[in-house]
Amino acid sequence: MSKVAVITGTNSNLGLNIAYRLLEKIPFSEDITIVVTSRTLPRVRECIELINKFHSQLERSGSLSFDYILVDFTDMVSILNAYNTLSKKYARLDYFFVNAAQGAYSGIDWFGAVKEILVSPMKAVTNPKYKIQKVGVKSDDGMGLVFQANVFGPYYFIHKLKPLMKKGNCKVIWVSSLTAKSEYLNTNDLQLLESDMSYEASKRLVDILHYATYEELAKDGIHQYLTHPGIFTSRSFYQYLNVFTYFSMLALFYIARFCGSCWHNISGYKAANAIVHCATSDVSALDNTIKFGSATTKTGKEYVDFDKSFQCPDSEKDAVKLYFEDLRNEWDLKLKDQIKDTRKP
């Protein structure tokens, strides 16, 4: 039976490289179906073409099949429809990568960027604060846009897909961030509507949610892991860079790596290492209580590092879990009789 892998945000640099590395790491005799997700059909076609091209270079005897769902994680009806499509076609899911992410960016504070680079260059290219993010942006569903796109939307999707995941002893891999610091999240603002660092706060929320839910999922045979890709070149910010600033950024990344930063992977392929490591390693060799990070040496040799530093009071984890469960139940009621065909763009 062909294994089934759902990769959210497949059309991103990281999403494509998750697919590439997964094909390299699973047994070459194994049949697999990759479910490409995107908001638009042209991007789906582009992804399938690129993954097929990569696969043709591998000496695999197992077959590769493709499927797709059009899903927007800032639209709850879209998520429900995507679930309906998958539940009709598949009896089980084996891999589920929570990679789709969105930020409410509006530009770069160039004065702040120059100052930060001069004062603390390593911090400036590892945990920057000069990216300008809009405050108070809501989705059409009335929730915090970044909260819904990065955390609640995927969480709700997983909730709906649990029966399929249970049958496949699915591995759920959340992609967090190196910047998921506790200082960015106000637990009185879980929808991140008051935050000017909503992207980073959403990733901190991902961390808390993982630690609050992985044990419960394990009871159903669903294995959930927390990862981060380190620092790499992402297309999400290209619109704010010109040729000079882009190559300056790359140069700073390489300098940071040479100076000892293990997190500057730079390439999307190396950034996907820890993510696929968790997906393809034996469960007995993995630990749900740590955060797996993609890392490299000064010379660019890749490896998987481990972060055991997560700290969060149990009361905070319990409060976050309860908030998500209540919101999930609320949307279960709202979404009755809302299913449509996801294959109509």
Feature-to-residue mapping (PLM):
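Conserved NAD(P)H cofactor-binding loop of Rossmann-fold oxidoreductase domains
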Residues: F97-K134
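NAD(P)H-dependent oxidoreductase Rossmann-fold/reductase module
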Residues: M1-N81, T85-D94, G103, K171, ...
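Helix-to-beta-strand junctions that scaffold the AdoMet/dcAdoMet cofactor pocket
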Residues: M165-G168
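Juxtamembrane membrane-interface segments at transmembrane-helix boundaries in membrane proteins
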Residues: G136-D140
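A hydrophobic alpha-helix adjacent to the NAD(P)-binding/active-site core of NAD(P)-dependent oxidoreductases
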Residues: V135, V146-F147
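A short, exposed helix-loop element centered on a Lys and neighboring polar residues
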Residues: I158-H159, Y211
